[in-house]
UniProtKB/Swiss-Prot annotation:
Organism: Homo sapiens
Pathology linked to this chain's protein: Ciliary dyskinesia, primary, 30: A disorder characterized by abnormalities of motile cilia. Respiratory infections leading to chronic inflammation and bronchiectasis are recurrent, due to defects in the respiratory cilia. Patients may exhibit randomization of left-right body asymmetry and situs inversus, due to dysfunction of monocilia at the embryonic node. Primary ciliary dyskinesia associated with situs inversus is referred to as Kartagener syndrome.
Function summary: Component of the outer dynein arm-docking complex (ODA-DC) that mediates outer dynein arms (ODA) binding onto the doublet microtubule. Involved in mediating assembly of both ODAs and their axonemal docking complex onto ciliary microtubules.
GO BP annotation list: brain development; cell morphogenesis; cerebrospinal fluid circulation; cilium movement; determination of heart left/right asymmetry; determination of left/right symmetry; epithelial cilium movement involved in determination of left/right asymmetry; flagellated sperm motility
Disulfide bridges in this chain: none
Gene that encodes the chain: ODAD3
UniProt entry keywords in alphabetical sequence: Cell projection, Ciliopathy, Cilium biogenesis/degradation, Coiled coil, Cytoplasm, Cytoskeleton, Kartagener syndrome, Primary ciliary dyskinesia
Top-level taxon of the source organism: Eukaryota
Annotated spans, Disordered: 1-69
InterPro entries with a match to the protein in the record: ODAD3 (IPR033192)
Subunit and interaction comment: Component of the outer dynein arm-docking complex along with ODAD1, ODAD2, ODAD4 and CLXN. Interacts with ODAD1. Interacts with PIERCE1 and PIERCE2; the interactions link the outer dynein arms docking complex (ODA-DC) to the internal microtubule inner proteins (MIP) in cilium axoneme.
Cellular component terms (Gene Ontology): axoneme; centriole; ciliary basal body; ciliary rootlet; ciliary tip; cilium; extracellular region; outer dynein arm docking complex
Name used for this protein in its record: Outer dynein arm-docking complex subunit 3
Amino acid sequence: MTSPLCRAASANALPPQDQASTPSSRVKGREASGKPSHLRGKGTAQAWTPGRSKGGSFHRGAGKPSVHSQVAELHKKIQLLEGDRKAFFESSQWNIKKNQETISQLRKETKALELKLLDLLKGDEKVVQAVIREWKWEKPYLKNRTGQALEHLDHRLREKVKQQNALRHQVVLRQRRLEELQLQHSLRLLEMAEAQNRHTEVAKTMRNLENRLEKAQMKAQEAEHITSVYLQLKAYLMDESLNLENRLDSMEAEVVRTKHELEALHVVNQEALNARDIAKNQLQYLEETLVRERKKRERYISECKKRAEEKKLENERMERKTHREHLLLQSDDTIQDSLHAKEEELRQRWSMYQMEVIFGKVKDATGTDETHSLVRRFLAQGDTFAQLETLKSENEQTLVRLKQEKQQLQRELEDLKYSGEATLVSQQKLQAEAQERLKKEERRHAEAKDQLERALRAMQVAKDSLEHLASKLIHITVEDGRFAGKELDPQADNYVPNLLGLVEEKLLKLQAQLQGHDVQEMLCHIANREFLASLEGRLPEYNTRIALPLATSKDKFFDEESEEEDNEVVTRASLKIRSQKLIESHKKHRRSRRS
């Protein structure tokens, strides 16, 4: 959409014949020429004078009644625009007058504050007397302390100046906002007047603006809702932060205890892993040793067998040789006797060889080389066999007894089957009653458990509250109380009653101390101190206080010749710079607190 200034320039740039042929363009040009004059405010002139446009229109439109009607409409529009301009001029004059009144009032306040500062700087005694009159309860404390009284008063003065500057800044911002809203209102009125005669682009623009306004309102409502939710969350978190320290302490203690347990378990695990590795190495070494010894025994047995066979063959050859040699010399009787003796000797040797082979197999099977250990194993096997026989007999007796019990139970089952349905029904009723009683007991147990949990939660909340209250009253000491000089054990069973008694004694003592004082006056004093402390806490770290000298001359702080120059109002640029610095200091302070 083109601006009204562009349309006015294009309308003024047309030749005379084009202006006569397009009266609507001249109407738009005149409307546009009135709009920027309204926006520029006072002291601005219209694009052309009404007399010139009137004469020109009569000269060009002679004999055309439509031109007269257009001229009349243009006169009406010009009158409306002139009325809008006058209204805007009057509102601007009223704003200027109001601002001048505000400036004069602020000048008066500044002069009064300067006079007050001059009175305060006249002497130490006067300042001390003023401070003592203002704070009667601090009279013994500030009687002979002029420096501290001046510092305190200077601090109060600086705080008041800060509050005044903040209020001035808010007033300036609201005035600027009011001017912007008035300007927007005038623009909306002009656009509405123009939209009544034009139903094309301006109407579309109005609808778009209305849609945007509705969207902005919806977003604003949503933002307000989100803000309320965040405020509720903040309040909830503030309530939770009261008990957060105790919970954090308990959780930290639990974490430390768990870390110690984890370290101990790591040590035990490492020892177990080392023992496992050692056992594996020993087992592997024993297996390798066993395999080597077994192979060694097998080689030794095979060598012994070979030597025995060789000796046997040599003996047989020697026997055959001796038999052939003595065969001719001996008789048949002697030959038979020698044969019988040799046969007996061979049988004995063969039996000895068989016994050695069997004994070697037994050694291979048992893995022992000594005869005594082999005998002990066979004796142990005999004892084991006897124990197994005993267990076998006992198991047979148990089996017989169980068979008898089974037969007896089967007979009882048959008796129960044919004993009738009355017993079964009664047993079912008893079972149903027992189940109902069980359900009641379970419900009662669940209710008791819930009550116990609620009581435990209430006890925990009370304990946390009492601990918080005790931490607030830690500076109060009760010398003649029950708990004087005693330290309460949090792990003891009577910790909560003892803590309640201690808090009660401290509160009673505090109440007794407050009986002779004015409560309202003390509350006001505490509120002022908390406000000042909060302001001091919000200052950044690099902000330092410079103490003013006590003995100063009048010309050093108050110059009557430059009084007129000091009455000048702070400019908008300097006010913007100061407000920007103040906002940046607050942001830095918040970041430092978060970090």
